[in-house]
């Protein structure tokens, strides 16, 4: 293989990757190619930080595989939401992949540093840092990481998510209306 072919192949891959990112940014800002594929920016904000007052979650900085799974779950019906299901159904698989990559590349908020040695000042902090073992509830940090920064692709960051969104998700896990976790970990915890 000649150096010229290697350089041409590398340049082509760079251009394709850049085109993929541009498509993802377009979907985020303007919507997908199908009717009903509204722009993400409408609910999740220009920076992907969500809209706390309306309970729309932060998407910026979430792992691409996590975002892709959630959109695919909305599309298949294994995760239900009257707003997100029709939007996800209107996205093609390529659009889901592109927007997932763009969201993952957006900067996430810097979480507040929490030291395990600090005593929680309220019930929510106690649950997050220490859990409620008397009710067999592990600390949120056990799966979602210190300061809620997330662990891998399976345990998303909680830091920076609006409280109303987190409360709605816990309620959905508790009632069984959210069940897109193969092991139902959160269903048991909630």
Language-model features and meaning:
Residues 22-25, 29-30, 36-76:
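The feature marks the first
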Residues 1-8:
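Bacterial N-terminal signal peptides that target proteins for export
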Residues 42, 51-58, 73-116, 151-157, ...:
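Axial heme c-ligation environment in periplasmic c-type cytochrome domains
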Residues 23-27, 66-69, 83-86, 98, ...:
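Extracytoplasmic/secreted proteins, especially bacterial periplasmic and envelope-associated proteins
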Residues 8-17:
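Bacterial N-terminal signal peptides
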Residues 17-36, 47, 55, 105-134:
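Electrostatic cytochrome c docking/interface patches
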């Amino acid at each position: 293989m000649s150096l010229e072919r290697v350089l041409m192949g590398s340049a082509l891959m760079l251009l394709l990757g850049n085109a993929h990112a541009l498509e993802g940014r377009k979907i985020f800002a303007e919507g997908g190619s199908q009717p009903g594929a509204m722009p993400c920016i409408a609910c999740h904000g220009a920076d992907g930080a969500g809209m706390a007052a309306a309970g729309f979650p932060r998407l910026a900085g979430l792992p691409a595989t996590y975002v892709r799974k959630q959109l695919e779950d909305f599309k298949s019906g294994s995760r239900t939401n009257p707003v997100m299901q029709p939007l996800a159904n209107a996205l093609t698989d390529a659009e889901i992949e592109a927007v997932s990559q763009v969201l993952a590349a957006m900067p996430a908020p810097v979480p507040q540093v929490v030291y395990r040695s600090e005593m929680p000042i309220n019930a929510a902090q106690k649950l997050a840092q220490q859990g409620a073992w008397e009710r067999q509830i592990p600390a949120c940090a056990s799966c979602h990481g210190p300061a809620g920064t997330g662990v891998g692709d399976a345990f998303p960051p909680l830091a920076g998510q609006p409280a109303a969104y987190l409360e709605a998700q816990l309620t959905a896990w508790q009632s069984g209306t959210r069940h897109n976790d193969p092991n139902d970990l959160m269903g048991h915890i909630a």
